[in-house]
Structures are given as structure tokens and as C-alpha cells.
Amino acid sequence: MVTTAEKTNIGYITQIIGPVVDVKFPSGKLPQIYNALTIKGTNEAGQELNLTVEVQQLLGDNQIRAVAMSSTDGLVRGLEVVDTGAPISVPVGKATLGRIFNVLGEPVDNRGPVNNQETLPIHRPAPKLTELETKPSVFETGIKVVDLLTPYRRGGKIGLFGGAGVGKTVIMMELINNIATQHGGVSVFAGVGERTREGNDLYNEMIESGVINKDNLNESKIALVYGQMNEPPGARMRVGLSGLTMAEYFRDVNKQDVLLFIDNIFRFVQAGSEVSALLGRMPSAVGYQPTLGTDVGQLQERITSTTEGSITSIQAVYVPADDLTDPAPATTFAHLDGTTVLSRGLAAKGIYPAVDPLGSTSTMLQPNIVGDEHYNTARAVQSTLQRYKELQDIIAILGLDELSEEDRLIVARARKVERFLSQPFFVAEVFTGSPGKYVKLEDTIKGFQKILSGELDDLPEQAFYLVGDINEAIAKAEKLKG
């Protein structure tokens, strides 16, 4: 959605390189940085054009350089370009719920126009320091490994780190299913440079679970903003800001607690690096844009909780080649309250969700926040798994029989703990055939205490695999014996 200035300011295209377009304006009439420009009309081949570009640089000699928000196919030099006099603006408020938008805030779900008057520009300052809310509180997700080892902060930022195909999107879909249905507030999902198929699956999943009510959109609890893999880098670079702007309105004006899901934050960085060289910037480490820290900071600092309302954000972060030291994930780490790291090794063992219990962290896991019982159980689980990890080399070389009695017991319990950290998901029912489970935090803590205390030493480890709470594991063991 692009607003037009009263006095039309018209320029013409002088150069097109991929998604980057140079435009010449009359002297003294240059648009401002981040202004939206529109290119409409017909080219020489008779193609209808309707394109929005965003000003990135003022080059001198009355020329500006802009990045296109959709494909530049069919553009030719000399075409007219109109300055709208304002940044890209997107619709906000209740009318956005249950709808799918593109980066410009145009609905793309074939359900007609959005009937609301209010729009906001996607470029806005972050809240002031004095407006921030700092009281820590934890919210329950119903996923055992998350609630026990990396509790999520209400109004915090959580990263889901993982390489290709280890289950980031599935965990995110499960979190949307669990939290959006339990949480009662509103959610915004920004699909940044991910697969179109997953976007479609997610939409259908939400209609089934009732998060989107197709018959009465006002009762829906989520707004979706998509800029998929096949879109030009301009769209992928800005779609996160479009989603965030919708979330900010719910927080600041409606004074609501909002959930913001971003899948995938790496694609936002990747899109920035794709256009960076075309904008004439020198690449920095590993070919990323030199403005990497600023780009990520401008997005992340707006995702925060104020005294008016909160934004709790869950962001998937693709890790290139499983290397957590890559500049993109490393820069994102600095902004997060909790990190849920997914492990390819666990995924290969078939343990889903493949959350690494030793590599994942949370600033919330402190006795004065979660309580002593939760804290001590979580640390005991981690130390048992750490000891098992240390013993694995000895087991590989000498075998289990060479371990002391005590170490053998630790290994047996660690293997049970590892399996009990797996869980059937509601959103994966179609693939696994097992009904999904939501496990309350107290049941999670009780279950791990029983395993570590030795109460369940005589049960086979297979009984703990892909179950909900500990009673299900005991029932499964009975079945296996029977």
C-alpha cells in the first residue's frame, strides 16, 4: 500500500541492474531515503507494469538508487517513476487478522481488499529506553525440552537455530499451534524468504486449528505477511519490517500482548547481502554486507516490550553449513534472550524435536525466576547428558562393559532422558500418525525427576521415546512387556 504525495514528483529510469534501479529526478526534487516510488505504465512490448521501488541512496547529479519490491522484468530505460512522498505503508489493526499480505501490505489471499483506513510506514524508530518494560516472566509452550531447559521469556526474543532440514519450521508451527490457541492474544507471522509450500501448509494448518476463522475473519488471531524464496531480494529484505509494523500497532495502540513469528531471519540478512554489492558497497566477512550489524539491530531493537504491551518474538535462524560462528547467526545471537539450538545428530537419531539440550541457553533459567525445583532438575538433566557425552568415546573404543557400575547407570538414565526429551507434535500428526501432546511444566519436571532418581531404572528406554508425560511412558512400558 503506497500513499501518493499531493504534488507529483516525476523522474525517469536511467539504469537497471537486476533488482536495483537508478532514477533521475528534476533538480531540487529528489525523494528522501526510504521513500516508495511507483513505476506504472506500459513498456515497448505492451506489458502492463506496476512496480514499487524503495530509495536506498542519493548518488549526486540528481540521481537516486532504489531497490525493487517485485520483479524488474519488462522495465526499460526512460520509463516514468513517481515519488509517493512517503515510505511503504502497510494496513494495521483488526482488519489484518486472518489475512495474508505481501511486503507492500496488499492482500494476496484472493479474499478481496482490506476494509480499514489505518496504515503505518514500515520504517519507524525503536521505542525509547524509558518506555521499555523489564520485568521477567516465563510462558509455557507445552514442549518438554523447551520448558525445562530453555524457558521462554514473555516479551523476550527467542532464536531457533539450525541447519537445513532439522525441523525449525515444524517447531515454529507447533509453537504457533500451542501458544496462539492457548494464549488468547494476537499473533503476526512474517514468512521471510522461506518455501511457498510451507506458507501454504501453515495457512491451512491455522484454518484447521481455528487460529484463522475463514467464515468470520474478525475472530481470527493471526495476521500473515509473506515474502517467499522466489521473490526479489527487496521484498525479502523488507517483509520482516512489514510484519513487525503490524505487531507494533497491536502493542502500542491496542495495548495487547503480541506474538511475532519470523521464519527466517537469516533470509533477511541474505537479501541484504544480495543487494549490497549492487548498491556499490564493499563486502565484509564471508561476503556479507558491511552494514550487517546495523541492519539486524534496526529490526531487532523494534521487537521489544514496552509499558503498554509486549511483543514476544520467536525467530527461526538458518545456520549456513551448520556453522554457528557464521556472521549472520553470530550477529543475531547478541539480540536474543534464549537460544534453542537444533542438532543434526539428534535429528539423525530420530529424536524430534531435535533440540540440543547442552547447546541451548536461556537467560530465564535462574532459581530466582523459575524456582529451585525447576532449576535443579534442569541442571541435573544437563549434567547427566554431559557425563554421557564424555563417556561416549570410552564406550566406542572399549564398550559398555568396561565402565564402572555408577557410570553404566548414568549412561542408562541419560539414554532415557534423551528419549524422553522427544515428543509427538500436533502439527506433525499427518506424518507420524501419533497424536500430538501438550505437556504441562509441572508434569515435565516430575517426569525427569523420576528418571534421574532411579525410580524407573527397570523400564526399557524405548518406552520413553515419543511420549507426552511420564505416565504415558510407564503405560508404554507395560504394553512393550505385554
Curated annotation (Swiss-Prot):
Please give the Gene3D superfamilies that the UniProt record associates with this protein.
Answer: 2.40.10.170, Bovine Mitochondrial F1-atpase, Atp Synthase Beta Chain, Chain D, domain 3, P-loop containing nucleotide triphosphate hydrolases
Q: Hey, what's the signal peptide range on this chain?
A: none
Main localization, broad class: membrane
GO cellular component terms given for this protein:
plasma membrane-derived thylakoid membrane; proton-transporting ATP synthase complex
- Highest rank taxon of the organism: Bacteria
* A Pfam entry, by short name: ATP-synt_VA_C
- Keywords for this protein: ATP synthesis, ATP-binding, CF(1), Hydrogen ion transport, Ion transport, Membrane, Nucleotide-binding, Thylakoid, Translocase, Transport
Question: What's the EC number here?
Answer: 7.1.2.2
The GO terms describing molecular function are:
ATP binding; ATP hydrolysis activity; proton-transporting ATP synthase activity, rotational mechanism
Q: How does it sit in the membrane?
A: Peripheral membrane protein
Q: Please state where this protein is localized.
A: Cellular thylakoid membrane
> Catalytic activity, per the record?
ATP + H2O + 4 H(+)(in) = ADP + phosphate + 5 H(+)(out)
Q: Which residues bind ATP?
A: 162-169
Which family does the record claim for this protein? Belongs to the ATPase alpha/beta chains family.
> Its function?
Produces ATP from ADP in the presence of a proton gradient across the membrane. The catalytic sites are hosted primarily by the beta subunits.
Describe its assembly: F-type ATPases have 2 components, CF(1) - the catalytic core - and CF(0) - the membrane proton channel. CF(1) has five subunits: alpha(3), beta(3), gamma(1), delta(1), epsilon(1). CF(0) has four main subunits: a(1), b(1), b'(1) and c(9-12).
Q: What protein name does the entry list?
A: ATP synthase subunit beta
Organism per entry: Trichormus variabilis (strain ATCC 29413 / PCC 7937) (Anabaena variabilis)
